[in-house]
Amino acid sequence: MKIDILTLFPDMFTGVFGSSILKKAQEKEAVELRVVNFRDYTTSKHNSVDDYPYGGGAGMVLTPQPIFDAVEDLTKETERKPRVVLMCPQGERFTQKKAEELAEEEHLIFVCGHYEGYDERIREHLVTDEISIGDYVLTGGELASMVITDSVVRLLPGVLGNHASQVEDSFSTGLLEHPHYTRPADFRGMKVPDVLMSGNHKNIDEWRHKESLRRTYTRRPDLLEERELSKQEKKWLEQIKEGK
């Protein structure tokens, strides 16, 4: 996979893309990450990429020319048109399902905005997707693009050493992840549940499944509205509601 990120602040990505999973993914050649300063594409004699909005108003608006030219340059040798994703608070809310969808692509281009917003023609005639990572305001789209890149890249084949860990992550199954424990078995009187040390894998799996359901019910009940519960899950949920 290839991911290009268009930004005015490329230095922001150095630490994130040079660490942890994203660094390993590049070393394994599972992904090629490129950070491009779209100011390099401006034809303005003042090297500007924004201008005052027509009709007046506060703030500056990103002009279409440098972003269009950057995307066209990055895709001039590609046979299949890539997904061009705008980081935008008005966009579709980012979810695990969306990450899995994007992970199927060969080439992604993320456009990070700044200032007051984008010229509407970028939305209408260039991008294929608009994505928001939450209902809050960020200074620019850079942090959002880092979040999405990490979420997508870790799904690529061979990136994570433990596939089971990926499958069990929160949201991958539609439920929040179950609690985890490690040594010591008794820490200041706080003990690990006996079932986890029983060696009975069937009981352990059932405990983890039920605790995932419990955690989802108490913390993110909205996720259960989107999930078709099995007969056993419905039974557990009734027990959970009764405090069992």
Curated annotation (Swiss-Prot):
It comes from the Bacteria. Its EC number is 2.1.1.228. S-adenosyl-L-methionine binds at G113, I133, G134, D135, Y136, V137, L138. Pfam families: tRNA_m1G_MT (PF01746). It catalyses: guanosine(37) in tRNA + S-adenosyl-L-methionine = N(1)-methylguanosine(37) in tRNA + S-adenosyl-L-homocysteine + H(+). NCBIfam families: PRK00026.1 (NF000648), trmD (TIGR00088). One of its GO terms (molecular function) is tRNA (guanine(37)-N1)-methyltransferase activity. One of its GO terms (cellular component) is cytosol. Belongs to the RNA methyltransferase TrmD family. Keywords: Cytoplasm, Methyltransferase, S-adenosyl-L-methionine, Transferase, tRNA processing. It is an enzyme of class 2 (transferase). This is tRNA (guanine-N(1)-)-methyltransferase. Specifically methylates guanosine-37 in various tRNAs. It comes from Bacillus anthracis. CDD domains: TrmD-like. HAMAP family: TrmD. PANTHER family: TRNA (GUANINE-N(1)-)-METHYLTRANSFERASE. Its main location: cytoplasm. SUPFAM superfamilies: alpha/beta knot. Homodimer. The lineage of its organism: Bacteria, Bacillati, Bacillota, Bacilli, Bacillales. GO terms for biological process: tRNA N1-guanine methylation. InterPro entries: Alpha/beta_knot_MTases, tRNA_m1G_MeTrfase_C_sf, tRNA_m1G_MeTrfase_TrmD, tRNA_m1G_MTases_N, tRNA_MeTrfase_TRMD/TRM10. It is found in: Cytoplasm.
